[in-house]
């Protein structure tokens, strides 16, 4: 049964309250731009509060102007995830036996570790085959994810990296494409599941949709995102490497994710309707 509005509000409020309580325990380190502490891990760039704020604002505006600037979206995610939200996500992993194993093992999702040729050989409806087919159809690679730079805590940096590398699995099990409309639907789902601010802020890109796309998003995909995002398990705790041979429908049901409206099929049907309407108009005008 889908959550009631009151239950949904309480769920989000509780997750945000957890973020606030965690934030009372963790604060930004104070230092100047001329006296930076040493990096906590390879590639780490310590930022002052002002620098973090400027990075958040600049990357937010830049990614709104060009939603395909994945580097800006990544920077926005890191700049707004601390000090509260990334710790909540880390603690969600610590509260789960599988999440703790992931934190201990530190697996990485790359084309080498996933062995894409093997995934393509798996049964048709398996998680691995579905994931590989989605990568091939969308023309993307698991190796394109940016490395985390701006999160100070080394363990939390891995949590953000893990979330980032799992994003394509979320696409695959839901079937949502990488077009703006599909990304917005997935980001809305991720926001309610992870409470990472960047995923919620990304919804501002809805202003870039065409009127028909925007109406479809708010009527179909946003309600789906709310239902599934609030009722599903914490996806950060899925050990995807161990699920590759499972049936994707069974896993989706186990995680509490409702299959979203098929965006590609909807767009295909609309194109056909527009084509028929145009042909009828041409016949009526005698052309």
UniProtKB/Swiss-Prot annotation:
<keyword id="KW-0472">Membrane</keyword>
<feature type="binding site">
    <location>
        <position position="171"/>
    </location>
    <ligand>
        <name>Zn(2+)</name>
    </ligand>
</feature>
<keyword id="KW-0831">Ubiquinone biosynthesis</keyword>
<comment type="function">
    <text>Lyase that catalyzes the C1-decarboxylation of 4-hydroxy-3-methoxy-5-(all-trans-polyprenyl)benzoic acid into 2-methoxy-6-(all-trans-polyprenyl)phenol during ubiquinone biosynthesis.</text>
</comment>
<dbReference type="InterPro" id="IPR027540">
    <property type="entry name" value="Coq4_euk"/>
</dbReference>
<keyword id="KW-0862">Zinc</keyword>
<feature type="binding site">
    <location>
        <position position="168"/>
    </location>
    <ligand>
        <name>Zn(2+)</name>
    </ligand>
</feature>
<dbReference type="GO" id="GO:0006744">
    <property type="term" value="P:ubiquinone biosynthetic process"/>
</dbReference>
<comment type="similarity">
    <text>Belongs to the COQ4 family.</text>
</comment>
<protein>
    <recommendedName>
        <fullName>Ubiquinone biosynthesis protein coq4, mitochondrial</fullName>
        <ecNumber>4.1.1.130</ecNumber>
    </recommendedName>
</protein>
<keyword id="KW-0456">Lyase</keyword>
<keyword id="KW-0479">Metal-binding</keyword>
<dbReference type="GO" id="GO:0031314">
    <property type="term" value="C:extrinsic component of mitochondrial inner membrane"/>
</dbReference>
<feature type="binding site">
    <location>
        <position position="183"/>
    </location>
    <ligand>
        <name>Zn(2+)</name>
    </ligand>
</feature>
<keyword id="KW-0999">Mitochondrion inner membrane</keyword>
<feature type="binding site">
    <location>
        <position position="167"/>
    </location>
    <ligand>
        <name>Zn(2+)</name>
    </ligand>
</feature>
<comment type="subunit">
    <text>Component of a multi-subunit COQ enzyme complex, composed of at least coq3, coq4, coq5, coq6, coq7 and coq9.</text>
</comment>
<dbReference type="Pfam" id="PF05019">
    <property type="entry name" value="Coq4"/>
</dbReference>
<dbReference type="InterPro" id="IPR007715">
    <property type="entry name" value="Coq4"/>
</dbReference>
<comment type="pathway">
    <text>Cofactor biosynthesis; ubiquinone biosynthesis.</text>
</comment>
<keyword id="KW-0496">Mitochondrion</keyword>
